[in-house]
A protein has these predicted regions:
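Active-site rim/loop-helix segments in enzyme catalytic domains that contact anionic ligands
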Residues: 1
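Active-site cores that bind ATP or allylic diphosphates and position pyrophosphate for catalysis
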Residues: 4-323
């Protein structure tokens, strides 16, 4: 399965919520995720604090953001106010943040966390056979050997595809920023006061993605939020257009296919299950989300210099193992 693009390009809270909703609707009994903490009780405690004190935390965060603090830093201070500095420090690490959001959203399944070891989330170095996704992308773009870091089949797939370089992505972003009007870009969910205008004024002056992101970044807007904002601008994701979550099947076994068929018949799954993106009778409540998936795929194919028809979401069907 995949998380729909609208949620994949969203905040940790929305990303986690969409993922958990998909898994629980599919009947998952356990949900496993990585964290720097590796301590499920520790993560559960922070989750409980956030669930039990939403009004107090939200008011504190709003106040601190008005003072110029970023959302992540304001949230840490809000938790510190309730639990003390030691516990709140958990939210300084990116995978702990996501883990806490998973814990907040899980209703039925049993959560399990695996302690992350080796390089950090955004580290572009590798240690032995351990590397972050950022490091693998960096090494691939540098034409370095990634064999020890990936399963053999994954390496074959990556080596066949032209990597999406930051330069290509940056050029596409610049075109979008120059051609879109500020009112359109203001609708990006991760946007903020003056950010769209600053983007439009900066693209002619910046020479790389890092240069652009650093120009837009501020005490209030973190690099992570800027990266989300830029992706949302490129994909014209509109905060005012609602889409429901749905389950997009990418691959399955024959046994999995039979399970999905029984799940649909039972009515236990409340989300739409999609195996064919070209169907014209998709429910109205998910059409916008699907349209962003298709656009994201088309842009990716352009950036990878792949055949636009052959690799189109309209043409590709789920991979069935064993066939």
């Amino acid at each position: 399965m995949e998380i729909p693009t609208v949620f994949a390009c969203s905040s940790a809270q929305n990303f986690a919520g969409a993922g958990v909703e998909i898994l629980e609707n599919l009947g998952a009994d356990y949900i496993s995720f990585g964290s720097e903490s590796g301590n499920i009780e520790e993560l559960a405690e922070i989750s409980r604090v956030m669930e039990q004190n939403p009004r107090e935390i939200d008011e504190f965060i709003r106040l601190k953001i008005k003072e110029g603090l970023s959302y992540p830093r304001a949230r840490i201070q809000a938790i510190e106010m309730i639990t003390g500095e030691e516990q709140a420090g958990i939210l300084d690490s990116p995978n702990n943040i996501l883990a806490v959001e998973y814990m907040r959203k899980i209703k039925r399944a049993v959560p399990i966390t695996v302690k992350r070891t080796g390089p950090g989330y955004n580290d572009v170095t590798a240690e032995g056979e351990l590397a972050s996704a950022s490091a693998i992308r960096y090494l691939l773009n540098e034409n370095r050997d990634i064999s020890p870091l990936l399963p053999g089949e994954s390496k074959k797939i990556l080596m066949k595809a032209a990597p999406v370089s930051e330069e290509k992505y940056f050029n596409m972003l610049c075109y979008r920023a120059l051609s879109a009007d500020i009112a359109q870009m203001d609708k990006a969910p991760a946007g903020g006061e003056g950010l769209s205008n600053k983007l439009k004024n900066s693209v002619r002056l910046c020479r790389s993605l890092d240069d652009l992101a650093d120009t837009l970044k501020s005490k209030r807007y973190t690099r992570t939020r800027i990266d989300r904002f830029l992706a949302q601008v490129l994909l014209a994701i509109d905060r005012d257009v609602h889409t429901e979550n749905y389950i997009r099947i990418l691959a399955l076994s024959k046994k999995g296919g039979a399970y999905l068929k029984d799940l649909k018949k039972s009515g236990a799954c409340e989300l739409t299950i999609i195996t064919n993106m070209s169907k014209e009778n998709l429910p109205e409540e998910i059409r916008y989300g699907v349209s962003r998936d298709i656009l994201a795929s088309d842009i990716y194919n352009l950036l990878c210099e792949r055949d636009m028809y052959r690799f189109s979401e309209y043409v590709r069907k789920p991979f069935i193992a064993g066939e």
